[in-house]
Amino acid sequence: MNYDFDTVTDRKNTNAIKYDLAKKRGKPEDAVSLWVADMDFPTAPCIQKAVAEKAAHGIWGYSRPDNRYYDALKKWYKERHNFEVQNEWVVNTPGVCFALATAVKAFTNEGESVLIQKPVYYPFFNITNSLQRKVVNSSLILKNNHYEIDFDDFERKIVQENVKMFILCSPHNPGGRVWTKQELQKISEICLAHNVLVVSDEIHSDITFGSNVHTVYGSLSEQALKNSIICTAPSKSFNLAGLQFSNIFIADEKLRKAFSEELDKTGYDEPSVFGIVAATAAYSEGADWFDSVKSYIWENILFAKKYIEENASQIKVLVPEGTYLLWLDFSKTGLSDSEINDRVLNKAKVWLDSGSMFGKEGEKFQRINCATPRIILEDALKRICSQF
């Protein structure tokens, strides 16, 4: 089936934070918004149909997933990731960040250490800090436009800081790495050796390109499976973030019980009725749409790389192995981080995520969302390149 990803859908005045928060956050209201990680495409027709039918039913009371959801979820992970999910492993939460916070509260105490790898998705350290845990950082190493893990530093920090939990970003946001099985196995070996629980944020796991293959952390070994909390959701793959629905895989019964007990303390019980319906439709009927949108996004990424190389060659493009996020390196411009931010936001009038939001290691970088109609992406690139 052919899908139209070129038509622009006006999202202004729809309560979309990507567009309607500009004034509140002091951003130019005429800026092109490519900051937050949601798509500018309507979701798959099969999902729209399923949600519309549920809306027409008119009764949206407390709901829980049934076997249609579990069967679709298991089929998706088996076919896409060769990972066999068991029904009892699945805990639903209203978002992956909610699950991260729940895990930090359930498995660490105030003052204990949680390891992350900057530059990284900023809720990792914002949530950890807000819960009065100690953030320990093992910075990724950038070599030839490619991030690598410093395993010596990784293990040293775990030992020195008595780390209790490691939050893994897989695939990596914002750097776009799809970690190899060998890299993940090394992480697992170190964490198992030092009794460090792994919380793996795999929300972008479906979105990989070329020969890059996502490895579900729990597929590494039985020990890795039982020492991990794997956070997944249909939100990035199918543009469903606003429905607040995630699938958290916890194979170990004791971990799952502790996580669920912490979840209960928040007052959260049943997931969104529309989240259940949308996720079920996505995983059971959405494959063709997803494959099409992923191809379109990859074409956008290649378009952006070529455009920047031809019009602002001092900006270096880190081509992602996964995610629809492009990480742009402005360090060769000779400008300071604040000067780069000012040129992009106030002169080019493009609202991106400043790299410094992801940690000091992200200074002089900008993150741009490529899940948008090409005409919007081209407009943003023209504006940016005109200032550098």
Regions found by a protein language model. Name each.
Residues G334-S336, R343-L352, F358-F388:
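PLP-dependent enzyme catalytic core of the Aspartate aminotransferase-like
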Residues W60-E189, D206-I207, H214-S219, Q223:
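Conserved core of the PLP fold type I
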Residues N2-G95, T102:
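N-terminal small-domain helix-loop-helix segment of the aminotransferase-like
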Residues K49-A50, E222, K226-W298, K306, ...:
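Conserved core segment of the aminotransferase class I/II
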Residues L131, E161, A193-H194, N311, ...:
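Helix C-cap/helix->beta junction micro-motif
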Residues T280, Y296-K305, V317-F330, G362:
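Conserved glycine-rich beta-strand-loop-beta hairpin in the small C-terminal domain of fold type I
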